[in-house]
Amino acid sequence: MVSVLHPMHLVCQSRFLLPAYDGAEVELAGFVWYQGWNDGVNPKTAVPEYEQNLVHLIHDIRKEFGAPKLPVIVGELTGPWVEAPKEWTALRKAQAAVANRPEFKDNVVFVPTHDFVRKAEDSPNPGHGHHEFGNAETYFLVGDALGKAAVQMAGRDRQVREIRGWTLRVDER
């Protein structure tokens, strides 16, 4: 069974999960969203509402954490259906459209992952397409792209930063 931990739980439990940071202030610096398969298999109801639901999710997370400009990285749905039926294409377009909304300018980014999926015959589990055939290269490429986007987003609007008692001011001239 796979369970998803609520982000607030992770923040509250950070001293147990990351003991080296016990006592340090914890800041949620961003949120990565890489999901859509379950919506894609429900094309009649979930796909048409995906964009608006993702917008609501972003607003809800920002409200929950009191972070109105929290950076959000939306990873494109991957899978063996890269050249998929129109419903999957519509879902991917909805993911990209969220990042293009004026209300999310400069704090939500869409990360294309379309080209990272490796063929079934080049993968260890060719019958398990909804997890990219278990291909580690696909996982690495997706994770690397999402991570790079997160690092780039974290650097925006961070002119003053406190790190363990030090205050850093960044001059980006």
Q: Predicted regions: what is each one?
A:
Residues 1-173:
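Cell-envelope and extracellular/periplasmic
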